[in-house]
Amino acid sequence: MAIKDVQTYIDRHGLVETTDSEVDKPIWRRPGFNGIRSLLEMEEELSRFLRERRDALNLNREQVGMMVGLHQEIYARHERAGAKLRVARLLHLAELLDFSPVEAVYAAAPHLFGDSREEAEVKMKLIMRMLDLPSSTAQHLLMMIEELSPDSPLDNPPKRSKA
């Protein structure tokens, strides 16, 4: 059943009404560390992240485009924020360029990881360390964390403070 009063939801989650050049109507967003990053700025950060990953692997656009099934010029649009990056394409690129989708989300929206830049950086480092853990170590860490915080995050979504 839908929430009867969406304004209560908006207030509880610290959302603010804003405009964005990508959307014709007002939208609600959660402010980041320096206000609200536009949707285009987030696309540009995703693009920069993809380009840096590709460069770090010494691949060119033609090679990545071929692996994705796109002409190099079409793929290049993703690296210039000229084409919207669908989630499925991002996941495919994560497979090809050997990154976690979490890294891409962090590049575009670090404010989703903490209330300050420092907190977000710490949490991102922790996430990346956890992703590299052997399975048995991850299981032990999970058991330890569950002892510290017995409620499952799926049962009780985290309450984010208003930015």
Predicted regions and their residues:
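N-terminal flexible/basic segments that precede or flank functional cores
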Residues: M1-E44, T137, L141, S161-A163
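Short alpha-helical DNA-recognition segment
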Residues: D55-R77
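Short, basic-rich loop-to-helix N-cap that marks the start of a DNA-contacting helix
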Residues: N58, A81-E95
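Short C-terminal boundary/hinge segments that cap the last helix of small helical domains
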Residues: D98-D115
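Interfacial/linker helices and their anchor residues that mediate assembly or domain coupling
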Residues: L112-A163
